[in-house]
Amino acid sequence: MKKLLILPLALFLLVQSGLAQTPKWVEKAKRAVFSVITYDKNDKMLNTGNGFFVSEDGLALSDYSLFKGAERAVIVTAEGKQMPVSLILGADDMYDVIKFRVAITEKKVPSLVVATTAPATGADAWMLPYSTQKSIACVSGKVKDVSKIAGEYHYYTLSMQMKDKMVSCPVMNAEGQVFGISQKSSGADTVTTCYAAGAAFAMSQKISALSLGDVALKNIGIRKGLPEAEDQALVYLFMASTQMSADEYEKLLDDFIRQFPSSTDGYIRRANYYVAKGKDDQSYFDKAVADFNQALKVAAKKDDVYYNIAKLIYGYQLSKPETTYKDWTYDTALKNLRQAMAIDPLPVYTQLEGDILFAQQDYAGALAAYEKVNASNLASAASFFSAAKTKELLKADAKEVLALMDSCIARCPQPVTANFAPYLLERAQMYMNNDQARNAMLDYDAYYKAVNGQVNDLFYYYREQAALKARQYQRALDDIVKAVELSPKDLTYRAEHAVVNLRVGRYEESMKILNEILKDEPKYGEAYRLLGLCQIQLKKTDEACGNFNKAKELGDPNVDELIKKYCK
């Protein structure tokens, strides 16, 4: 009987000893630990695991594996309350950690303090499991080894037994601060040893400007947060605008404004987004106006906001809306722009002033603005091109227009690159309009080189016209053959091919081409006229006059003089 009493007494003393060693902070700290449930794209349960809060406003840590492939996630607190995971804020798939935000349903939640220093080898450690019961049960052990990861952070080997359901539970130091996130053991040492990634390392995970390309983050379908620094967040926004769906991008804009409420950039970008949506629903324009008004309220430099309002309205008018929204006219754009210029007359504002005046067909006013820009440090190929086109519309002397185009080309990278190559085409056309065909050919050749020969049939046709005018007949012939090759059904190219052959005295070849055209299109009047010209050269006047009369019947406007000359 005495032996039977001894065993329960020994067990009682052992339990009392264990309870005595449990730190006082455990009961409170355990309330910060929660269960995590993740769901896949079909809304089926994907994984379950643990995590814990590290701030009262819902910042939390767990393991990356739990979230991989998840489209949504919820947490269940120690009190049994469910809350959704709202944002992923950073992850590392190598060390299997993730930082995220929970959309908490209370003013604040119980949270743990992350230790700022690593515990020493041999220090006491406690692992806090998730539990919905009021219990101070925890697993105690020692820090067996501390190793460095990612420079200043740590990874821990613990002399501690751990069960599978305790992965991603917090590992605490004697002061009740979390220093590690428990990780699954493997191999022969699972009975006595487990591991923990540093909590400080998990906290260091963040979204950067380039995180849109991060494979680990892309494997999670839950929304991502923004970078903490505003400049990085702006780059992230810019990249997201072309990679996200419209709805996702709108939510991201909302997040940016919540995170940086005093930044005008968020309101301006969202206003531009709303205007794009306004093509289908004009109520979005009201939202854009509200955002611009808020931007003006928070702006330290209001001129930038006025400039962006002007630019947006100008772009809106350029799209030629069927009905104009309220007072969103070129005049309103100009009014906002001049408010910006009154605060700070920056050359970029003057450039937009010129563009708006140009759109209003006030070419004299536009030219005055462009000339101001060209005299400033903002002078560029684009500003000189704008001035050249405006002078051309004002019927200015061709030499003045070409001088401006020369300045435009001079401000392009040399040799001219593909992005600037269209300016060469513009100058080539101006040369052609002013009977400078050889100069036009040089620009066409420079364009061909700038775009690495990536040209179409129209380019070859234009260069052929220049070569023909410059009496470079072989080049003209080569280019028109190439144009026909690229677009064999185009009658203009085929007729031009006949013209070049006619010019170089290849009358039979020209007639062959023209007869093939008439086989495909019997009512093509120009072909009859050209056929007649070939026959005149071959002294076949009667046949030529028959073709001239056929061209006249079909409405060719250029045949009357030929009939007068050869057929009377």
Regions found by a protein language model. Name each.
Residues Q21-W25, K108-Y155, M162-M166, S182-T193:
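Flexible, gly/ser-rich surface segments that form the specificity/activation loops bordering the active-site cleft
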Residues T22-V26, V109, I181-L252:
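C-terminal cap/linker of serine protease catalytic domains
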Residues A276, G315-Y316, A359-Q360, L393-L394, ...:
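Register position in tetratricopeptide repeats
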Residues Q21-T22, Y39-D57, D63, Q82-P84, ...:
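A conserved glycine-rich beta-strand in the N-terminal activation segment of trypsin-fold
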Residues R269, N308, L352, S386, ...:
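Canonical tetratricopeptide repeat
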Residues N272, A276-K279, K311, L318, ...:
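Residue-level recognition of tetratricopeptide repeat
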Residues S55-L128, Q133-A137, E152-Y153:
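Conserved active-site neighborhood of the chymotrypsin/trypsin-like protease fold
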